[in-house]
Amino acid sequence: MGSFLRSFRHNGGSTAPSVGAVPAKKEPQPPPMTPLEKRLLDMGPIREDGSDKFYGMENYGNTCYCNSILQCLYYSVPFREAVINYPTRTPIESLEAALAKSLRYPNPNAQLEAEAQAEKQKAANAQRPGMPPNPQQKPEDKDSPEYKKKMALQTLPLLETQNNAASYGMSESLFTSLKDIFESVVGSQSRIGIIRPQQFLEVLRRDHEMFRTAMHQDAHEFLNLLLNEVVANVEAEASKQPLMEKSLPAPETADSVDQSSSTGSKTPNTTRWVHELFEGLLTSETQCLTCEKVSQRDEVFLDLSVDLEQHSSVTSCLRKFSAEEMLCERNKFHCDNCGGLQEAEKRMKIKRLPRILALHLKRFKYTEDLQRLQKLFHRVVYPYHLRLFNTTDDAEDPDRLYELYAVVVHIGGGPYHGHYVAIIKTEDRGWLLFDDEMVEPVDKNYVKNFFGDKPGLACAYVLFYQETTLEAVLKEQEQENMDSNLAATDANDTILKQNGFPQSPLAHVHSASQIPSHEDNLRPNGLRRAPTAPQLSTHHEHGDPESTPFSPLSPLSPVPPVPPIPERVATVATPPKNDALAKREEKERKAAEKEKEKAEKLRRKEQGARMKENQRREEAELKAALEMSKASKAEEDRRLSTENGKEKQGGGLSRLKRGSKSLSHRLGKDKETRSVSSDLPPVPIPEHSTLSQSGPTSEQQQQQRQQSPPNHDQPPNSPQPGKPTIREDEQVNHKDSKHERTGHGKWRSFSLRKKSFSILS
């Protein structure tokens, strides 16, 4: 058993590789293509103007402010052409010689060698007995910007700029360093790469002390300094030339023609191209409120700095920039006409518009509480196209239209730290993101992510607008629509099989018709309505199979013969809907349903309000009726209780008294009428009439009330049921007849009184 184990160990050990064996070398594999390289696959030959070059810039420690501004200036076509052509272009021989020294192509096996070196070091550390094992390192995120920048430095060509000012007859300055960068990119034979602006940074730190430290700098301050430095260097170089040479006209060479056409210079003085591109003219209008005199003062600007407000736009910020300002109290205006300090109104207007408008959004504001600058994360919307309105009446070209071509974005929580990137619109390759060494294509809507309201710390800081025309804008929009439609058609026309090979949808159409069976021939066909208008619903092939109408009378019709397909299909009759169109229709449908629900909810709310109002009105009417009924009932009860109380107190004697009083009253009236009608014959009065006039007794009235309950619904003055209604004129006539019957002799009253006593007894 032991020998078997020894032999097994011996055989197993022999299969292990020896320590000194050299592993086989891996074949070098090219790195995967970047999104930018895929975007540039269909590019034609390299252009001479450098518009098809897309280079990143190496960061030398907090130099992202410089890289982002230089990228924006390079892709400003008139500025780039003016820099390259002033004073003249560098000769091709000297430029090629400089590029041969400065342009270095990386080793394609550098990445594999670096990985092999790392594996070798790891294996050597593992074999050492005293060395602790290396902790497990997290794999690098290949989608992170840091990894992409590292790979770009290892795989892309590196372009180191050098001082080449002597070749075009100028002394070294910040302008010549900028010119060397632009010419190196234009003259290189590679479309992509990385620039090392070390020589430019050395000149910048040599001439300006504030940039000598490795601290975070402001991109807007650097832009203003660079433009002013370029103007100063160009004018200083122009002043060194002899006056005679300056006065002579320059020969019209091809370069000068290209320069005049690209820069659009209106004056022969070539040193004014910076002013013509970036410089504008502001007019400060101040009106004294005492004498109403208006004084004007002109100021030049290379960029406009506007204050920000929450939930605003660039247009509203410019409107606030030109709003009227009251000068009062400590800020009073010294009026020359009045000869003293007076209250006045002041506002700023643009008198001359620049060709390239640089808008600085004041994201950093000094706060008294913190005693330092603080970043404002206000939402400020900036448009793709802009037209300025705050111009004077005599402004030059006041209706100039601008288009956005570059955005400098600040990423960070404050002005003393953070990162700058640039998003630039190229001539024919769309929008690109320039993040130091990394250059990536982005969508047009990506520019809208930096209004200031998105999660994160990225906000637009400097906006670059360049002049354009309405025809160019319409042409660009038409081209964008054509590209989107073409992309949607290509995406829908290509259907992938399960194995991944593309297949045209026409291949699924059967080319032969099936022979109908005998049962199908005997089955009756249903009547079908011939459509006179195109159907709005989707085709059954692309729609929901459950939504396809099915008729029990219609047979399972075989596939009809397909007509021959022409060689070239001009147009698609009914193109299938793409995802974007379906999403838009779904969004519109949901919006319509939402509006319908809102209208239905509003209708139900109004109907409920009307029902509540009707119910409230009915309740008020019912309550008023009940109150009226209660009042009438209370009045009836009060009247009945009063009558009952008097009858209980007086009994029959009270009626006798009332009757005696009425009879005596009548007797007095008879005496008065006796003298008037003494000649009338006496009328005998029967005994029963006297009893009927006296009315029923109290016992009879009480019995009648018990038998017939009171009617509360009738008003107090309404006639009681069972009692005859007597009109007023009839009552008067009846009383007169009574007086006539009882008006002869006193014996009638005595006989009535006697009979009343007999009834009581």
UniProtKB/Swiss-Prot annotation:
Q: Which is a GO BP term held by this UniProt record?
A: carbon catabolite repression of transcription
Gene Ontology cellular-component annotations: cytosol; nucleus
What reaction(s) does this enzyme catalyze?
A: Thiol-dependent hydrolysis of ester, thioester, amide, peptide and isopeptide bonds formed by the C-terminal Gly of ubiquitin (a 76-residue protein attached to proteins as an intracellular targeting signal)
Q: Name one GO molecular function term.
A: cysteine-type deubiquitinase activity
Residue ranges annotated as compositionally biased, kind Pro residues, are 555-566, 712-722
Query: Which residues are listed as membrane-spanning?
Result: none
What's the superkingdom here?
Eukaryota
Ranges of compositional bias, category Polar residues: 256-269
Subunit structure comment from the entry: Interacts with creA, creC and qutD.
Under which name does UniProt file this protein?
Answer: Probable ubiquitin carboxyl-terminal hydrolase creB
> Which species does this protein come from?
Neosartorya fischeri (strain ATCC 1020 / DSM 3700 / CBS 544.65 / FGSC A1164 / JCM 1740 / NRRL 181 / WB 181)
Please spell out the taxonomic lineage of the organism that makes this protein: Eukaryota, Fungi, Dikarya, Ascomycota, Pezizomycotina
